Amino acid sequence: MDTSSVGGLELTDQTPVLLGSTAMATSLTNVGNSFSGPANPLVSRSNKFQNSSVEDDDDVVFIEPVQPPPPSVPVVADQRTITFTSSKNEELQGNDSKITPSSKELASQKGSVSETIVIDDEEDMETNQGQEKNSSNFIERRPPETKNRTNDVDFSTSSFSRSKVNAGMGNSGITTEPDSEIQIANVTTLETGVSSVNDGQLENTDGRDMNLMITHVTSLQNTNLGDVSNGLQSSNFGVNIQTYTPSLTSQTKTGVGPFNPGRMNVAGDVFQNGESATHHNPDSWISQSASFPRNQKQPGVDSLSPVASLPKQIFQPSAQQQPTKPVKVTCANCKKPLQKGQTAYQRKGSAHLFCSTTCLSSFSHKPAPKKLCVMCKKDITTMKGTIVAQVDSSESFQEFCSTSCLSLYEDKQNPTKGALNKSRCTICGKLTEIRHEVSFKNMTHKLCSDHCFNRYRMANGLIMNCCEQCGEYLPSKGAGNNVLVIDGQQKRFCCQSCVSEYKQVGSHPSFLKEVRDHMQDSFLMQPEKYGKLTTCTGCRTQCRFFDMTQCIGPNGYMEPYCSTACMNSHKTKYAKSQSLGIICHFCKRNSLPQYQTTMPDGKLYNFCNSSCVAKFQALSMQSSPNGQFVAPSDIQLKCNYCKNSFCSKPEILEWENKVHQFCSKTCSDDYKKLHCIVTYCEYCQEEKTLHETVNFSGVKRPFCSEGCKLLYKQDFARRLGLRCVTCNYCSQLCKKGATKELDGVVRDFCSEDCCKKFQDWYYKAARCDCCKSQGTLKERVQWRGEMKHFCDQHCLLRFYCQQNEPNMTTQKGPENLHYDQGCQTSRTKMTGSAPPPSPTPNKEMKNKAVLCKPLTMTKATYCKPHMQTKSCQTDDTWKTEYVPVPIPVPVYIPVPMHMYSQNIPVPTTVPVPVPVPVFLPAPLDSSEKIPAAIEELKSKVSSDALDTELLTMTDMMSEDEGKTETTNINSVIIETDIIGSDLLKNSDPETQSSMPDVPYEPDLDIEIDFPRAAEELDMENEFLLPPVFGEEYEEQPRPRSKKKGAKRKAVSGYQSHDDSSDNSECSFPFKYTYGVNAWKHWVKTRQLDEDLLVLDELKSSKSVKLKEDLLSHTTAELNYGLAHFVNEIRRPNGENYAPDSIYYLCLGIQEYLCGSNRKDNIFIDPGYQTFEQELNKILRSWQPSILPDGSIFSRVEEDYLWRIKQLGSHSPVALLNTLFYFNTKYFGLKTVEQHLRLSFGTVFRHWKKNPLTMENKACLRYQVSSLCGTDNEDKITTGKRKHEDDEPVFEQIENTANPSRCPVKMFECYLSKSPQNLNQRMDVFYLQPECSSSTDSPVWYTSTSLDRNTLENMLVRVLLVKDIYDKDNYELDEDTD
């Protein structure tokens, strides 16, 4: 039922309603007792309305016919608006029963007309929640003849909490719960005895919290009981909401101030923003334009009504035009309407009516709470498929009925940039960008411009931190340094020019002109006359204001004086009285004390205001150890925000290499908001206001709140595990670095340095960082990343003063024993039982004109002699001349004794190249050909660096007396290497080769035998691939050789002895014959092609002649040949080989060399560096292809690398490649940045149990830290992954089937060959191999990490292996194990 309905009774499910069988009326009998309150005189008469109680739990109510009242009955009875209140701890007394009116009441009420009654259940109340619930004033409309007899009581909705309004103010009602709170707004009755209650008995309930409010409780009479003389009229029970439209005439009559938007005037009372409170504090408003975002509501202000706009007149219909609603009495359980004369059942203490006992027993008194959609407010309690989402970066989750509501809510929370801050101005009503938000009286007013802001301020009579001349807003009280005291009032200005203009114009601000039209009848501020007379501060003489001399007074404000002499005399008098005055013990201002506090030591402290008392108490509790009192110090620090002086431990803010100090945490927070000190929070990764900066393992981490700091600490501690400790010296959370036991207590430290410093402090050997004295250091603070210790708070404050203004007396160190004794004496005096009063400090002298402090210095300190070197002789300066004298060596040169004035010869060595003959041993059969070969080599001049290096090696010939076959020097220019005869033995194909030679097959092509049955990589499936490299490389153009001759017949393929043992899992059987045959094909093509094109970096005037037999070449020759081979090799049809095919051919060449007992490794040895560089350039251009089944196509497989010993633990480089391959395959590290993030501290061994076989297996775990940040590259998607605390965990499980290829065994071998001090480091994983290490060496690696270029070359080759792209590879291996 709407609250504006007249003549009706509104009852909810919590309203006790007893309908008697003979009278259908609501009893007001003993209202006070029914809610466990005191008996009200209005209703507690002797037994006039008292009824007998029935002890039955369930009551039976009979419903009788009801007739509507006649609409034309006049009103004669007196009416009053009465308020009933009840306490919070009310309990229900008595039982509900059927109501039987007394005989006296029946006689007096005979013939009265019954009223229409509507009884709504709780569902009706919930359906009306969308209607307007907030009304500020309830004024009952009455006939003119009863106007003077009506008492108006205002009920403000501001006293209700938001939750309670939503819960209970949809339809007002009465509750019978024991802990409920009731407010009866209007109780209207036709009984004559009720109207005679005095007004003094009414209680005002404004400002009290309550759950429910009853707008009307009406006593209705029955038609059978007699007629009431004056009857009933609907207007007597109506509630009319009146609004006031301000006009010029109304303001003139009531004496209201100037134009005031948002005010309402009713019956002469001034209402501001919907409330009737007056302006107690002139600074009670807050401007949010500087500290709060414009589109965000100020925290802590929770008003029930929206932003007030200019009032508009609302048409109020008359009482006779308001319709009434029909009768609707339904069962609370089955919702069936109750017929006339039907028996109704009611439970004791409940307001619900039921049609039967079945409904009465099955009805639940407290229904389950309903869930509403956040956006559309739809009931979603029983709805399926609701959406729960976390929106607007909040910690709570919201529930929506559909995705459309979610989208609308997100759009509402995140509006577009253009309409981000557009709202309607309170003054002008324009929908535009808001510049100011003023919170006043629990109402937030939005103002679009400074013009509207000044109009609002002047209209409401608010005092603010604005310039008195131009009206410019000052962010804080300390921002306006230009202050004038005129007639005892302080006036602030933004600059000195405004001060001058204010003096000239005569104290009339210029911005008042904007609101002059609205200030016609205002008495708040009248313009003053030009040249106003002002009283001199010294002699109290009246002088013109602009002739006065201004000077800063002892309180820090500008004071006017008539002359300079008067100013000096007043200062002299004030200086004498100041020493005898009372000074505030906190801010040190000389003012009249408002508060006095007796401290535990018996001293009486004076304070100027309550703010100083609160700050002094808070800071004393923080700085006092174990609750002991600490006497205030004479040293004063200045807060960087409020500019007040204080003598306690300051709050420190380190920002942009500057340290700011504040008197309290509040000033520090306000300073951060005012100066926009924002940073990215280390935990939530959002740009917010800086809360605190904490060190973690020596790294400063900023946080936006205390919650983010605690959550980051938990993640950090969980990541380090048992190694995470808190350093006892620097108090940072870090990994355990040192441990020290002191007096039976084991203490942990981050480093040995902290351990040593803590030990010095513990044994009182450390010195104070201020006075440099040893002893007990009670205070400590972290200053610019270092811990500072001090004797007490006095030294701490002196240290902070030295940072702003250096003090020469504190820089002398511990040698100043007299100063140390003085410090100890002063401390002893302070702790005595009867401390003497401290001497009056010297008066601080300042220059009047420029306000600079005089610098006092000792002259002798800066006078030091200037030392100069001067020769004693008068002759010219002797210059020493050096004459070289060549003397052959070895010759004995006698050196005589000499004096300092004589010249003596000094021997100096000068190296001179001398040719020395060297005899080279050679076999007898080739000694005759050596001179001819040497002459031929000397005649060759090469411009290529590689060829020059190869030609210089021919001067050294190895001896091999057991050789039976002569090497043809003309066919091969280079025969030997530095190693000597060992390589010559390896190059003999007849004596050392264990693999049969491969016959040349010109048409043998690997890409024809193993075609690429795959789709071309396009834009549609490119996103399926992981990132291959950290950067993109352009494919270098390679020359094409000419096609020669017709196709030859295909020869049957030759298979090696290892082909039968190929792994069945490989897609392509590995055959080294493809590589050897490609080499022979390239050598033949190179010899026949006279126009061979080579790369610019490998060009030479005379190239090395190569042979088809690979075993006949030395290391240098193979390096040169393979470098050209990978760039010039072509398929038999003349097309280019794919990069994976070239890598496959090189692997075949390596297997052929290993099978022939050749110990060269073309992929690892330093002698093949040129070939490795050229091969890496080719492999960078490889792009994988996708097969129809979604897998990646590549001709290189993992089994090939194990067969040719590229993977394994037989050498340091091979072990390093194996770890790199396993990390790429199982950890899913596809970029160099991801490999560099690995460290010994993030990879650890772990035991895992198989849930099927219950067998424990060792595994390596790598937990990717969420604190590393997100890379620009794609996220890791491959590998075994587990979710623990939302952090990806990757594992490498032990391979029990083949221990030689087990990743856990390889990692353990790598740890055993690494230095022991690197096992726990967090910044290195891949180590540089030791150059001089052998296979039997205990340590293979150094402590230096591999460079980025080496890791990138390793990654290029690993990414060509097909097995790393198989997602199910590791899971299958795990199951088979």
Swiss-Prot record:
The keyword Metal-binding applies. Pfam families: DUF3504, zf-FCS. Residues 139-152 have a biased composition (Basic and acidic residues). A zinc finger (MYM-type) spans 327-363, 369-409, 421-456, 463-502, 533-570, 636-671, 723-758, 764-799. Residues 1039-1050 have a biased composition (Basic residues). Residues 85-177, 273-305, 983-1002, 1028-1064 are annotated as: Disordered. One of its GO terms (cellular component) is nucleus. The keyword Nucleotide-binding does not apply. Residues 85-115, 127-138, 153-164, 284-298 have a biased composition (Polar residues). May be a component of a BHC histone deacetylase complex that contains HDAC1, HDAC2, HMG20B/BRAF35, KDM1A, RCOR1/CoREST, PHF21A/BHC80, ZNF198, ZNF217, ZMYM3, GSE1 and GTF2I. This is Zinc finger MYM-type protein 2. It comes from Pongo abelii (Sumatran orangutan). The lineage of its organism: Eukaryota, Metazoa, Chordata, Craniata, Vertebrata.
